[in-house]
Curated annotation (Swiss-Prot):
Database matches in InterPro entries: Ribosomal_uS2, Ribosomal_uS2_bac/mit/plastid, Ribosomal_uS2_CS, Ribosomal_uS2_flav_dom_sf
Source lineage: Bacteria, Pseudomonadati, Thermodesulfobacteriota, Desulfuromonadia, Geobacterales
Molecular-function GO terms, alphabetical: structural constituent of ribosome
Keyword Ribonucleoprotein among record annotations: yes
GO cellular component: cytosolic small ribosomal subunit
Name under which the protein is recorded: Small ribosomal subunit protein uS2
Natural source organism: Trichlorobacter lovleyi (strain ATCC BAA-1151 / DSM 17278 / SZ) (Geobacter lovleyi)
Amino acid sequence: MSSISMKELLEAGVHFGHQTKRWNPKMKPYIFGARNGIYIIDLQKTVRYFKSAYNFVKESAEQGNTVLFVGTKKQAQDSVAEEATRCGQYYVNQRWLGGMLTNFSTVKQSIERLKKLDAMFEDGTIEAYTKKEALKMDKEREKLEKVLGGIKNMNKLPGMMFVIDPKNEEIAVQEAKKLGIPVVAIVDTNCDPDMIDHVIPGNDDAIRAIRLLTAKIADAVQEGADARNVVLQSGAEGADDLEEALADEVACEASAD
C-alpha cells in the first residue's frame, strides 16, 4: 500500500487552505487553525481521510471499476492527464461539457466522430478531400481531441470519479451524484464536503499538492488493478488445469474400455 506522510504533505503545501474570508463553514472539522488570514488544514485529518480514500479506490479498481480523473483548472491539467494515463484510466482536464455523464450516449456520438477523423488521417483517406476540406476536418479533430481525448476509449460510465476542486467541478460532481457514481475529491477550505463521498482535505490550488495527491490516487488504482490481474490469471490457470485433468480422466476411461 502506498502511504502518505506528514512530511510529504507539508513539503507539498497541502496544509494551506484559502483566506479565512473565503471559506465554507462545513469544512470546520478539517481545519487546524488560521495563520496570517489563511486557514491551515489539519494534516492529521488529511492522513486519516486519505488512507480511507486510498483503500476505497484500490478496492474499487480491484473489482474492475474504471476511474475518471477530473481537474480542469490550469494547475491540475498536467497531473490529471499524466497520472490517469499512467494507471490506464480516463480523464477530463480541459472543459467539462454539461451532460458528459448524464447524457453520455450523445457524448459517445462525438467520440465516434473523433475516432472516425483519427482513422481518416491515419489511413490516408483524408487525401481524397480538398485541402480546404481536410484543413476544416483537422481543426474539428483538434477541437474534439482537446475536450474528449481523455475519454476517447471510455465505452461506458466510470465506476468512480476522482476530482480536484469540487467547487470548480461542481457540474461534474452533480452529474456523478445523480447517477450514483462515488466521488473522491481533494477538498479545500472553500468547498462543500457534503457533496463528496470520500473527502481528502487539502490544498487544491498548489501544483505540488495536486501532483502528490493525484499520483497517490493513481497508485491506488494501479495497486487494485494489479491485484485483480493476479486473481484473474490464477483463475485462468486453474481453469486450464481443470480442463487438462478432465481430458486425462476421459482418456483413461477410454483406454480402460
